[in-house]
């Protein structure tokens, strides 16, 4: 039986997930996810991060298990390569450079751009066809192809709307989120202390700037998707040895209903005692280490 990945307080602390933004930059809607503040920086309540990450990973797992498609989105510099790496690892789709307005809500136009990209690819790979073009024309075609690839490389095999959107940095990717909301596509997102969690179905309180944190999130997301894929293949009677080949081709579309979940775990009774104790101890240890360094 497949096991959905899990994460603990220590792993989140080591990745710097608990560091929010300066208190002056916070979004009051994130109040219930904030533990406190240290040196004018908000500290995220990692007890809730652990609990809500589990809910989000289950959503990813269930989506892929039911042959759904996931679109990973983050166009910020520090996340761009990581998003592409892990989306490809689990055979899903991604946008990691620029979100083109209408990528979800005006799919017909985007599909037309993908068709142009595929035609350019076909032409540039055909040596015989290239003999009919000048060097300048070939150079222009190559430039057009490279420009299209920046925005479309991760979705060129996506033939319909995704079943789940996974976002890092909701402020930067607000257009993608708005389009997903219009189409009733569920959203998993890392929400930092300056974020608005309102339209996020599966919020994960955490730092959305640290490269270590982003890599940790994406690794967990990809592992959950791969576990879902494994279950999907077993149910279909597919040879597990062929799983990687299947992944490379992408998944077929199927509507996946939103999972019931609780967004906020502000009451300690919703957090197991072991996680609560671990978080409190970790913060105390951090304070003691800081005090000893300053002594």
UniProtKB/Swiss-Prot annotation:
The keyword Ribosomal protein belongs to this UniProt entry's keyword annotation: yes
SUPFAM superfamilies under this entry? Ribosomal protein S2
Cysteines engaged in disulfide bonds, as pairs: none
Molecular function per GO: structural constituent of ribosome
Q: May I have one GO cellular component term?
A: cytosolic small ribosomal subunit
Single Gene Ontology BP annotation: translation
Matching InterPro entries, A to Z?
Ribosomal_uS2, Ribosomal_uS2_bac/mit/plastid, Ribosomal_uS2_CS, Ribosomal_uS2_flav_dom_sf
Positions of the UniProt region annotated as Disordered? 247-295
Say if the entry is tagged with keyword Cytoplasm: no
Q: Name the keywords, alphabetized.
A: Ribonucleoprotein, Ribosomal protein
NCBIfam families referenced in this protein's UniProt entry, alphabetically = rpsB_bact
What HAMAP family would the database entry show? Ribosomal_uS2_B
Hey, which family's this protein in?
Belongs to the universal ribosomal protein uS2 family.
This protein is called what? Answer: Small ribosomal subunit protein uS2
């Amino acid at each position: 039986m497949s096991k959905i990945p899990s994460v603990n307080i220590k792993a989140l602390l080591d990745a710097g997930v608990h560091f929010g933004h300066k208190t002056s930059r916070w979004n009051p809607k994130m109040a219930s996810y904030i533990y406190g503040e240290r040196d004018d920086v908000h500290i995220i309540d990692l007890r809730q991060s652990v609990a809500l990450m589990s809910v989000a990973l289950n959503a990813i797992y269930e989506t892929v298990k039911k042959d759904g498609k996931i679109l990973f989105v983050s166009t910020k510099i520090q996340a761009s390569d990581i998003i592409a790496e892990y989306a490809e690892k689990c055979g899903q789709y991604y946008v990691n450079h620029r979100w083109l307005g209408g990528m979800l809500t005006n799919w017909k136009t985007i599909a037309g751009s993908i068709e142009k990209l595929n035609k350019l690819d076909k032409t540039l790979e055909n040596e015989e066809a290239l003999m009919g073009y000048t060097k300048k024309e070939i150079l222009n075609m190559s430039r057009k192809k490279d420009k299209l690839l920046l925005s479309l490389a991760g979705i060129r095999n996506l033939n319909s709307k995704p079943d789940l959107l996974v976002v890092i940095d909701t402020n930067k990717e607000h257009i993608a989120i708005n389009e997903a909301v219009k189409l009733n596509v569920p959203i998993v997102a890392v929400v930092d202390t300056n974020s608005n969690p309102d339209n996020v179905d599966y919020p994960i309180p955490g730092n959305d700037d640290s490269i270590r944190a982003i890599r940790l999130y994406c690794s967990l997301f990809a592992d959950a998707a791969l576990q879902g894929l494994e279950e999907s293949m077993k149910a279909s009677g597919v040879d597990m040895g062929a799983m990687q080949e299947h992944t490379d081709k992408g998944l077929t579309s199927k509507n996946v209903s939103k999972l019931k979940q609780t967004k906020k775990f502000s009451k300690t009774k919703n957090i197991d005692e072991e996680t609560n104790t671990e978080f409190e101890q970790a913060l105390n240890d951090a304070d003691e280490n800081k005090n000893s360094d300053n002594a």
